[in-house]
Design a protein with these regions (language model features):
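STAS-typified acidic loop motif
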Residues: 1-43
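Amphipathic alpha-helical interaction surfaces in cytosolic regulatory modules
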Residues: 26-119
């Protein structure tokens, strides 16, 4: 796995760096054991986005079965970090979701309420 990826027993994020997009594919269960590694991974992705001046991070949650509230709060913090960044380094988070998974529908709609300029949800 590359520097923008993570894997443990129950949770994985595999990331790919494109020209102006970073794609991160989540799978498994983002539970209490995922909080610290996910926080670190988000910081590394953010730093890479700023470094390469990417315009978007695509976050594919379609294979993610569960995410606890603490992990979801990390996304709220990430959005806040984007909003506080200088305009020339702001980027969009595009979530690919599974519309059949109820927690994704509810949580991502709430996250999108923070800003529709920098959070997009594709179902």
């Amino acid at each position: 796995m590359g520097p923008l990826s993570f894997h443990n027993r129950d949770f994985a994020v595999k990331s790919e760096i494109g020209t102006d997009t970073i794609r991160a594919r989540f799978s498994g269960n983002a539970d209490i054991d995922a909080i610290a590694p996910l926080r670190d991974l988000m910081a590394r992705i953010h730093a890479e986005v700023v470094r390469i001046r990417a315009r978007e991070v695509e976050i594919d949650l379609r294979e993610l079965e569960f995410m606890n509230a603490a992990c979801m709060k990390l996304f709220v913090n990430w959005v806040a970090e984007i909003l506080e960044a200088p305009e020339d380094v702001r980027y969009r988070l595009r979530f690919l979701s599974n519309p059949d998974v109820r927690w994704q529908r509810r949580s991502l709609v709430a996250l999108q309420c923070i800003t529709t300029d920098f959070v997009v949800v594709d179902r």
